[in-house]
Amino acid sequence: MTTTQDWIMIGGYGPESYNQQSSYQRALLEAAKDKMTEAISANLDLDLISNRFIVADFGCASGPNTFVAVQNIIDAVEEKYLRETGQNPEDNIEFQVLFNDLRINDFNTLFQTLPPGRRYFSAGVPGSFFNRVLPKQSFHIAVMSYAFLFTSKIPKGIMDRDSPLWNKDMQCTGFNPAVKKAYLEQYSIDTKNLLDARAEELMPGGLMLLLGSCMRDGVKMSETLKGTVMDFIGESLNDLAQKGVTEQEKVDTFKTSIYFAEQGEIRQIIEENGKFTIEAFEDIIHSKNEFPLDPKTLAISFKALYGAFISAHFGIEVMRKAFELVEVKAREQISRLHKVKPGMQYLIVLRKN
């Protein structure tokens, strides 16, 4: 397998940072708040709520959306406790939140922007969430927001020009069945490892809340808005190579370590793993739909998501030039964006078996 660059978001507070350009992800958390509350109310055993309650966010990035996610959970736990015991949770429960991401994540920005007046203690847990990062039975609820789509490696053969799996695109577009199969197999392996690790770390009866985006069954990545914009990124990098701004070899060897699985594929992987029961698989109505169809907003939003990863391979100036071209392509091909097929924004609730 070929190891990719570590995937992180652009840190800091600048106009290109994830901190400033992640309103789309935050909107899903806000839209899902009521369903998160319902899921915790229905599925969290009151016996788990002791005087110390621990929440863990895996793939927290540098904020601020992680704070929304964990606060949604804490609010729901307190509401359930008050309703079922009649006691004030502030008098009886201390909350701790564990923030996990790769060691090169911008934890400084994360901890400098912790919400004032928060009612929880906090700690950082650096490490890959594909592996164990905590002792057994360390927390009661885990959350992953837009992090349940990564693979740890590029599938073997994808970058080999002599292989039938050679993929000229930077992503898994879905149009080459062999490439899709290779990505799905790698995603399945990595997701199984992730679920195995969380099952060890979760308390018995604990919950995992997964929020993110997937494909509806039968829809190909490049038929969606996200896939189309990623195609624009690849085309822009090729344009820069043709102009001599970067090397064609760098473009040809640049592949993303993400796989937007179909809804049915996700369900099958979880069920075959056997460590969790799917308590809910909800379709969340996102207030911004897929993304706002504004070329500038699209370019800025995708730069926050992919910019650091692209910069690690090409350098920051090439990355910036590429996204300038992405905005141009989005404006020139706006009719194409209006014809894309919808993806799916989801909340998956898993209970540890």
Curated annotation (Swiss-Prot):
* Cofactor comment: Binds 1 Mg(2+) ion per subunit.
Q: Which Pfam family, just one, is annotated for this protein?
A: Methyltransf_7
Q: Where does S-adenosyl-L-methionine bind?
A: Y18, G59, C60, N65, F99, N100, D101, L102, S128, F129, F130, S145, Y146, A147
Q: What induces it?
A: Induced in the presence of the herbivory P.xylostella larvae.
Q: Which InterPro entries match?
A: MeTrfase_7, MeTrfase_capping, SAM-dependent_MTases_sf
Its keywords, alphabetically, are: Magnesium, Metal-binding, Methyltransferase, S-adenosyl-L-methionine, Transferase
Q: Which GO terms describe its molecular function?
A: metal ion binding; methyltransferase activity
GO process terms (BP): methylation; response to herbivore
Q: Which domain of life is it from?
A: Eukaryota
Q: Where does substrate bind?
A: Y18, Q21, S22, S23, Y24, Q25, Y146, A147, F148, L149, F150, S301, Y306
Which cofactors is this protein said to need?
Answer: Mg(2+)
EC number per UniProt: 2.1.1.-
Q: Which residues bind Mg(2+)?
A: N167, D252, F254
- Kindly report, in one word, the top-level EC class recorded for this enzyme: transferase
Which proteins does it associate with, and in what oligomeric form? Homodimer.
- Can you tell me which family this protein belongs to? Belongs to the methyltransferase superfamily. SABATH family.
Name this protein carries in UniProt:
Paraxanthine methyltransferase 2
